[in-house]
Amino acid sequence: MVGRGEVWWGESPDEKGRPYLVVSRDAANESMRRMLVAPVTTRLRGLPSELALGASEGLPVESVASFDNLRPFPKAMLVRRLGSLGARQHEICRAAGATLDC
């Protein structure tokens, strides 16, 4: 099962493959075909809506999950688990709150 706070490699026919951070809740992830994800990028802008990721989350270089670009993504196109936020899952709510200006 794909879980909240996990970093996965995603393949889409519309764009190049890239890592994604799963942000949708686990109860929805079990039954939905699409999950809410934050795309991961190496373009660090220092925004409060970014969540820093790196080697401890399974990425080869310093990166961020961009919550300003949240999107639904087909679960079937998440092809390989790279890592997880682990105890840092609470940071998902912080970045989402910054995105929504809450």
Regions found by a protein language model. Give the residues of each.
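Compact nucleic-acid interaction/catalytic patches
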Residues: 16-55
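C-terminal terminal-subdomain/extension
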Residues: 57-102
